[in-house]
From Swiss-Prot:
InterPro entries: FAD-oxidoreductase/Apoptosis, FAD/NAD-bd_sf, FAD/NAD-binding_dom, FAD/NAD-linked_Rdtase_dimer_sf, Reductase_C, Rieske_2Fe-2S, Rieske_2Fe-2S_sf. Keywords: 2Fe-2S, Apoptosis, Electron transport, FAD, Flavoprotein, Iron, Iron-sulfur, Metal-binding, Mitochondrion, Oxidoreductase, Transport. [2Fe-2S] cluster binds at residues 109, 111, 128, 131. FAD binds at residues 201-205, 235, 240, 270, 467, 514. The Rieske domain induces apoptosis. One of its GO terms (molecular function) is oxidoreductase activity. Residues 18-44 are annotated as: Disordered. GO terms for biological process: execution phase of apoptosis. Residues 18-29 have a biased composition (Basic and acidic residues). This is Apoptosis-inducing factor 3.
Amino acid sequence: MGGCFSKPKPVELKIEVVLPEKERGKEELSASGKGSPRGYQGNGTARHFHAEERLPTPQPYPSPQDCVEATVCHVKDLENGQMREVELGWGKVLLVKDNGEFHALGHKCPHYGAPLVKGVLSRGRVRCPWHGACFNISTGDLEDFPGLDSLHKFQVKIEKEKVTIRASKQALQLQRRTKVMAKCISPSAGHSSSTNVLIVGAGAAGLVCAETLRQEGFSDRIVLCTLDRHLPYDRAKLSKSLDAQPEQLALRPKEFFRAYGIEMLTEAQVVTVDVRNKKVVFKDGFKLEYSKLLLAPGSSPKTLTCKGKDVENVFTIRTPEDANRVLRLARGRNAVVVGAGFLGMEVAAYLTEKAHSVSVVELEETPFRRFLGERVGRALMKMFENNRVKFYMQTEVSELRAQEGKLQEVVLKSSKVLRADVCVLGIGAVPATGFLRQSGIGLDSRGFIPVNKMMQTNVPGVFAAGDAVTFPLAWRNNRKVNIPHWQMAHAQGRVAAQNMLAQEAEINTVPYLWTAMFGKSLRYAGYGEGFDDVIIQGDLEELKFVAFYTKSDEVIAVASMNYDPIVSKVAEVLASGRAIRKREVELFMLHSKTGDMSWLTGKGS
């Protein structure tokens, strides 16, 4: 560590994309957006891109009056591997000591403001305790998702065994940092039927792909198209906050897309992909050519096929308008939710204080049974029953009855008749890939798009990501899986963008998801399909527990409530490549009464 602060010397920023020798003849995008035969020099070496070609106008170095400086502790106050929040007057900073070095970072996760001091420090990064996002402690950069922004990194100096931090006042208050991005310099942008990168689907995967391309220096045309009428938004929040408005859910403001030349096509439905001519056809007849294509169409919710299926006031929730209409119709009235998965249970929880009655219909014996197991499912079911939710289990809807075309009753196969003014369906989804059936792009028997570790389809130059894909899950021996989670879509979108630029990145992240019901958060990491045992530490009745899901001798997933940061800890261990054995958990259960999880740092087997 240096003994004083100094203004950094100007540097020439260069972005270099180098293909391996064997790959240099292939047509990959360079950071300029051109195909490699044009974007690379004749001798096969990479072109260098200078800062002035791609960066926004740099901010001036903060003047002394714009900064705050404070001595926060003695070097011996923190052990290696410890974190502490320290106050600088204008805001707090996360101070980290790792391998004898001190690092100062923003103290809140930019995703939803979790205090990172309560997270997990491991392998040179800190993992958020709430949703699992990871940040490099040396740079502040976002390394694993969810979220879009990174942390600010502040200057640290050591003098006479004292640790002093210097930080910009503005950075302390913002608590998030958007990475430097290229701007579009293509003369044809917005005025041509051709594009370098076309992204079909503007969810998490599509947006992260576009942003990653710009972060990596790609300065040619990017077009992002969506069926929605809105700019990209946090769809995962719809079922948790039915009153949320589009502007509240927006992931980026419209000025962001304008500033970085990411063109948006809203209410744009793709009907055909012509891979031979690298062309996409839209429903209105508009056509766009592409050099690289990302397919991130997401999924379509399943609907009922019973008698009366077309009556009014029966909803699937895909847009803010859907959510808002459900809330409006449910206020003071009778709501029925079909399906006790995450979406259905989140909607039911939200409506308990708004509707006159809330009923849940489910084919299984308990909510979440296949995902969380019988015991955890029953504990959560009891929480809902204590909040006035009525369950009708091991049955399904046989008829929807209407009066003057509007829903009045839901009839179950058990012959039970439920009064209903509004019905929400949460019975699963199917990949929205019908437009690809005649394209030559591979689909499996269920309609998913199979991709490899680099998010490549069977067609060169065509990538896929998000809810509509199956991919090899690295830490489960490359088992082909579909994981329709918000965090996973982020990660896949980044890998797709990196491989459009020939960076040979591979998808390698531990699935992480969460939900919130009645003010309580459930967190989950791993991939637990096929678990054969559940080991529970804590108190299910008090909803303070951690559940380890095992298959044979290995922990394959973990879930918790009021037990942070255990899920982030397990996720970090699994991400490191270390297996957690069932016997480790069993021994912990036998000998530990404290809830201490330090055993997870052991070497294991």
